[in-house]
Swiss-Prot record:
The lineage of its organism: Bacteria, Pseudomonadati, Pseudomonadota, Alphaproteobacteria, Hyphomicrobiales. The keyword Endoplasmic reticulum does not apply. One of its GO terms (biological process) is protein repair. The active site is at 118 (nucleophile). This is Peptide methionine sulfoxide reductase MsrB. InterPro entries: Met_Sox_Rdtase_MsrB (IPR028427), Met_Sox_Rdtase_MsrB_dom (IPR002579), Mss4-like_sf (IPR011057). GO terms for cellular component: cytoplasm. The keyword Oxidoreductase applies. Its EC number is 1.8.4.12. PROSITE patterns: MSRB. HAMAP family: MsrB.
Length: 146
């Protein structure tokens, strides 16, 4: 499957999805659609469809945004230094869609690598496990629990 950013995909974004993914915005804590989602499946870029995170790597960090211990495929995320708002953080973007996803912090579960990928729900689309094969994500089924 080829993952890319397209004008058509951008045009389908809601105002909030556009603000987050294209203007490096952040959704308000506690408001994201996927914050409490516990269904098995994968999270893909809302713009390009590239697979980003597996439900098996999602955990409750109590930070107000969906949190993951690692990307489903390292090559699908890029990390950049973000010095906005008087802080130094590591921004996470999708590699193919170039969508702003959120940030990664070194305070995740130590036994799972020590990282916390703090991700905006507005940058994601959830693909339930029972739809993964039909939507072309069957190669990732072994990374999803259940």
């Amino acid at each position: 499957m080829k993952y890319q950013k397209s004008a058509e995909a951008i045009a389908k974004l809601s105002a909030e999805q556009y603000r987050v993914t294209q203007e490096n915005g952040t959704e308000r804590p506690g408001t994201g659609e996927y914050l409490y989602n516990k269904e098995p499946g994968i999270y893909v870029d809302i713009v390009s469809g590239e697979p980003l995170f597996a439900s098996s790597d999602k955990y409750e960090s109590h930070c107000g945004w969906p949190s993951f211990t690692k990307p489903i495929e390292r090559a699908n995320v890029t990390e950049l230094t973000d010095m906005s708002h008087g802080m130094v953080r590591t921004e996470v973007r999708s590699a193919h869609g170039d969508s702003h996803l959120g940030h990664v912090f070194p305070d995740g579960p130590v036994d799972r690598g020590g990282l916390r990928y703090c991700i905006n729900s507005a940058s994601l689309r959830f693909v339930p496990k029972d739809r993964m094969e039909a939507e072309g994500y069957g190669d990732y089924l072994d990374q999803v629990e259940g």
